[in-house]
Amino acid sequence: MLDKIPNMDDITALVGQSLYDVWQKLCSAIDEQYDMDCIWNSGGRAWTYEYKYRRGGKTLCALYARENCVGFMVILGKDERAKFESGRSEYSESVQKVYDDSKTYHDGKWLMFEPVDTSLLGDFMRLLAIKRRPNRK
């Protein structure tokens, strides 16, 4: 948990206006579909901030921010990987490449994206739907 939660100006100053817009659109899309607890943390060694979407002790996804960069991470477990692989042709080539290049750990395949625009937003939301059905009507 962070001592001071970053505000809009803090994130904008860190990532820049265009990436802040990507961050905002991604958060809005997730918030529209999912009722989740949102938790701010430090981003560890590689990132300045982590903004995690969780519910019932399970993480849906996390957004990361560092200087001039935004990250979006989703971890797919064994069953979720099977669902992705059965429908992989529905995803863009760049999402398939990140999937193929991502390391598989004991708890799943960690997919880290560094979006520069909103072109992959639909793919990101499909990945989240594999993990959890949207719970907002």
Regions found by a protein language model. Give the residues of each.
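Charge-dense, helix-prone N-terminal extensions
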Residues: 1-137
